[in-house]
Amino acid sequence: MLSSFPVSATQLGDTIAAVLGDKVKSLKIALGEVTVTVGAADYLASAVLLRDAAGCRFEQLIDLCGLDYSEYKDGQYDGLRYCVASHLLSVSLNQRVRLKVFCPDDDFPVVDSVNGVWNSANWFEREAFDLYGIIFEGHNDLRRILTDYGFIGHPFRKDFPTTGYVEMRYDAEQKRVIYQPVTIEPREITPRVIREDNYGGLQ
């Protein structure tokens, strides 16, 4: 049964802190929302606790996404680069929490998959892998989901070029779609304004 009167963010934060204990790296409350960050080694266990603990009961994962912090705060950020953020919902207790975990290795970002905890994580984790290159350990079908299987790189990484590396086009001679190096040339477009005499009835 849905609770009509959810606890306050402060109360929820206290409950989560008590449930997760020393697994909590940080816990913040902003705009009435609770964000808890755990270590990569405790991520899977924390997910199970948040789902099953009496004061939490986050039965649904409603979103999971990757984040690239390499340009955070105009490049002044010096923490770990890749993060996975999950948004959890308790239907029975009418409350939400954001769960974050940072990948411990910037060169080879890996965290545990929570697909076994929430089935909805399946495609979300595939999307984060496709766009950010984050590996989800234990995921049983970690394939690209948005880009082509032959795509080079991960397009949501901050260092990925806006134009990409290759483009696809139909080759009439080969009668098939082919890849070729990007042919877009960057150019600067400066708008030119021509103001006529007595423009708009003004002298």
Swiss-Prot record:
It is a peripheral membrane protein. It is found in: Cell inner membrane. It catalyses: a quinone + NADH + 5 H(+)(in) = a quinol + NAD(+) + 4 H(+)(out). NCBIfam families: NuoC_fam, PRK06074.1-1. PANTHER family: NADH DEHYDROGENASE [UBIQUINONE] IRON-SULFUR PROTEIN 3, MITOCHONDRIAL, NADH DEHYDROGENASE UBIQUINONE IRON-SULFUR PROTEIN 3. NDH-1 shuttles electrons from NADH, via FMN and iron-sulfur (Fe-S) centers, to quinones in the respiratory chain. The immediate electron acceptor for the enzyme in this species is believed to be ubiquinone. Couples the redox reaction to proton translocation (for every two electrons transferred, four hydrogen ions are translocated across the cytoplasmic membrane), and thus conserves the redox energy in a proton gradient. NDH-1 is composed of 14 different subunits. Subunits NuoB, C, D, E, F, and G constitute the peripheral sector of the complex. Belongs to the complex I 30 kDa subunit family. This is NADH-quinone oxidoreductase subunit C. It comes from Polaromonas sp. (strain JS666 / ATCC BAA-500).
